[in-house]
Design a protein with these regions (language model features):
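Extended repeat-based scaffolds of very large eukaryotic assembly and lipid-transport proteins
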Residues: 25-132
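C-terminal motif of bacterial Sec signal peptides marking the signal peptidase cleavage site
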Residues: 18-21
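Bacterial N-terminal signal peptides that target proteins for export
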Residues: 1-9
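Hydrophobic helical h-region of N-terminal Sec-dependent signal peptides
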Residues: 10-15
Length: 132
């Protein structure tokens, strides 16, 4: 009886160890990857393509936009760099500017802006004034 119990216990232990060794843990995507994927999902939504209102794209993808906001300061740095390096000034840049403003929270110095590049221009001017 003891031998049967011992063999069963060993078999169970070996099976548990084998299964845990085969388990692959997925790495959490970086802030940059999360933001790139989220922006791509939002701006390439065919159902919303007829809308010119960026808030429609955000409202249609609340969970995706929330993922951008959950990237924190690492995400903010990435968004600012992407806005700076972008040659465009469209929907994607507008969403990046809004996310940046929301990530800054009360520290967002820009209250009135017309486009993503406009927000960035004002942000950079105010930041430069504060660094003097």
């Amino acid at each position: 009886m003891k031998r049967k119990w011992l063999m069963t216990s060993l078999l169970f232990l070996c099976t548990a160890l084998a299964l845990s060794a085969c388990t692959v843990t997925a790495d959490k995507p970086s802030a940059a990857e999360t933001i790139k994927q989220s922006l791509n999902t939002m701006v390439n939504e065919p159902v919303l393509a007829s809308s010119s209102n960026p808030n429609d794209y955000i409202a249609g993808h609340r969970d995706v936009y929330k993922a951008i906001l959950q990237t924190g300061s690492e995400g903010l740095n990435f968004l600012l760099n992407q806005l700076e390096s972008s040659d465009d000034n469209g929907l994607k840049e507008w969403i990046m500017a809004l996310a940046s403003a929301e990530l800054l929270g009360e520290d967002n110095p820009v209250q009135d802006w017309d486009s993503g590049k406009d927000w960035l221009r004002q942000y950079n001017m105010i930041a430069a004034d504060h660094s003097d």
